[in-house]
């Protein structure tokens, strides 16, 4: 378990964040644990929210947690598809991803992921890209909707 002194905690924690005592409780219970954080793509296209998100992930990392970020990219994907003249089809709120669409989705998500990783590295937060195209970690079955 990572030992962090109170003086160090006060330097790491944002001034508007939780109290040191509250953080210490979580550190004792969850230090060196993986934390999976899902962040929607619409949050990350706002530069101010993106910067706050990066700062929060960096803070978690400095506290000894191991954050894993799972991100979306809906707005960027829609914008890129529109730019390329590819019409999006949705069924019950889910995007139908044909071959042409999935290639754009993969490209946009990989670029977005690289931006997140680069921003984290600039904050001295150890991070790396993991995605299905490069790391071959996801297999998919076609779902037929009624």
Indicate residue ranges for each PLM-predicted region.
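Nucleotide/pyrophosphate-binding catalytic subdomain
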Residues: 1-146
């Amino acid at each position: 378990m990572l030992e962090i002194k109170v003086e160090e905690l006060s330097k790491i924690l944002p001034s508007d964040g939780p109290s040191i005592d509250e953080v210490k409780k979580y550190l004792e219970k969850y230090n060196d644990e993986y934390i999976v954080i899902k962040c929607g793509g619409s949050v990350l296209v706002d530069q101010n929210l993106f910067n706050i998100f990066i700062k929060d992930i960096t803070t978690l990392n400095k506290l000894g947690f191991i954050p894993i970020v799972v991100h979306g990219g809906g707005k960027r994907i829609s914008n890129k598809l529109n730019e390329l003249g590819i019409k999006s089809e949705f069924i019950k709120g889910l995007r139908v991803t044909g071959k042409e669409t999935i290639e754009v989705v993969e490209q946009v998500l990989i670029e977005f992921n690289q931006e997140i990783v680069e921003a984290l590295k600039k904050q001295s937060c150890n991070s790396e890209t993991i995605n299905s195209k490069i790391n071959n970690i996801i297999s998919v079955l076609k779902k037929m909707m009624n």
